[in-house]
Amino acid sequence: MRSDVIKKGIERAPHRSLFKAMGFTDEELERPLIGVANSFNELIPGHIHLRKIAEAVKAGIRMAGGTPLEFNTIGICDGIAMNHLGMKYSLPSRELIADSVELVARVYHFDGIVVIASCDKIIPGMLMAIARLNIPAIFVSGGPMLPGRFKGEYVDVKTVFEAVGAVKAGKMSYEELKLLENFACPGCGSCAGMFTANTMNALTEALGISLPWNGTAPAPYAHRIRIAKETGMQIVKLVEKDVKARDILTREAFEDAIAVDMALGGSTNTVLHLMAIANEAKVDLSLEDFDRISEKTPTLAKLSPAGKHFVVDLYEAGGILGVMKRLSELGLIHEDRLTVSLKTVGELLKSAFVSRDDVIRPVTNPYHPRGGIMILRGTLAPNGAVIKVSAVEGVEVFEGPAKVFDSEEEATAAILSGKIERGDVVVIRYEGPKGGPGMREMLTPTSAIAGMGLDKDVALVTDGRFSGATRGLSVGHVSPEAAEGGPIALVKDGDIIRIDLKNKRIDLLVDEEELRKRREEWKPKVKELTGYLKRYSTLVTSANTGAILRH
């Protein structure tokens, strides 16, 4: 066993003595040592209940003859971090989480590991770690939150974000907003829609690195505890057969995950995260792969923020395997690849079902013939940009004058004070991975635009990124970013920007000679940075490569 390095032989008597100081018996030390990386904290609704999940995982490990060793890592709630300095630290936390899990796992030579997380950057951080470690590993989440009910309607945190704009526009009273706060998020779990957290949870199941139903079983349901126990039991089987993370995280697995992502109309953040995880798994994944798979994958679901359904509806309709079953009809799923269940995808699909065609549409009646995420290129984004087309309605071409802001705060203030008009293209720059630094999510400005009823008439373009809760004509991940001298740094108020979804282009309609003059005059904005952000900004790469760190 890998763990023999720290527990076998006469030289390891001191090591065993230290284990015994924690109450471990000789018999426990003879068994496989299974790391349990928990991200429980009292800071995130999706993580507040993870102690219970970890206890179930550990029970399963013991039942199967292993010895669990639990440790913790950090986690940040993107919703609470939104629209202030805190959001600069969200994406950078992904790398810290991966590094912290790697550090502990390397020191203790775990025979296998179970990683537990529910929310935005913690999930990819955990997956990056297990891909890097390449030992037997399974991911398990705490599950999605249930939607709330307010005045007879289902609501979620997106409803509250958009209500802020509605209050500013005089469409809702502040007293009604205060009431809504109490009902939108009814309990534990990752926010109820197909936002970043739940998209990533869904993709762990599509990748095959979690057990069936992990992607959708709601946080309050007993099914979630059963999945956690089964995960604990299954990791011991993976150790016995020495099935490692990269045996699961193959190129075919990533292609299937992208197909599921496109069918669900998932968060644009998945583009960053899947590329970062693939990088650790030694799989070459690029924006071209997302574009290629999106072109042939129909959008089969419209969950919040794009539609009226929530993740609990997807669970009841057949879950992620139900989506994969539908996609397999088009030959879009690699059915012969292995999953952590030790069954192939094809074997799992034999028991898959779809019980609600209104939630998971048939491939003959999709919401859209192509996938929910589109890669744009053009003179404004030579290296690519990303848009969630599943959250855009009735717009194929949008052309308008730019209103340029060098920070999210400036843009939000302008939107809420009524300075943005129908037909405008709001440009928010110097918010990229390096320039932010940290590539903040622009949920507050996009929600304000939507809440004021302008989401079909105003576009937003940024080198930052978006929450999975964002809807409307929102183009993010513009690359190269402003801090690296990308064309977005040269945009001026009044410049015409054209977004053409039919031809997958985003162009700055300014002649080359004028841009050449502007480039000669351009000077990068210098921000005074300290601590982790200073180190991060010097090491982080572009959004079009997953915003990973240079090694």
UniProtKB/Swiss-Prot annotation:
Top-rank lineage group of the source organism: Archaea
Protein name: Dihydroxy-acid dehydratase
Cellular component, GO, one term: cytosol
Cofactor mode of binding and number, as noted: Binds 1 [2Fe-2S] cluster per subunit. This cluster acts as a Lewis acid cofactor.
Organism: Pyrococcus furiosus (strain ATCC 43587 / DSM 3638 / JCM 8422 / Vc1)
Cofactors named for this entry: [2Fe-2S] cluster; Mg(2+)
Keyword Transport belongs to the record: no
UniProt-annotated binding residues for Mg(2+): D78, D120, K121, E441
Reactions it catalyzes: (2R)-2,3-dihydroxy-3-methylbutanoate = 3-methyl-2-oxobutanoate + H2O; (2R,3R)-2,3-dihydroxy-3-methylpentanoate = (S)-3-methyl-2-oxopentanoate + H2O
In-chain residues carrying the UniProt-annotated modification N6-carboxylysine: K121
Primary role: Functions in the biosynthesis of branched-chain amino acids. Catalyzes the dehydration of (2R,3R)-2,3-dihydroxy-3-methylpentanoate (2,3-dihydroxy-3-methylvalerate) into 2-oxo-3-methylpentanoate (2-oxo-3-methylvalerate) and of (2R)-2,3-dihydroxy-3-methylbutanoate (2,3-dihydroxyisovalerate) into 2-oxo-3-methylbutanoate (2-oxoisovalerate), the penultimate precursor to L-isoleucine and L-valine, respectively.
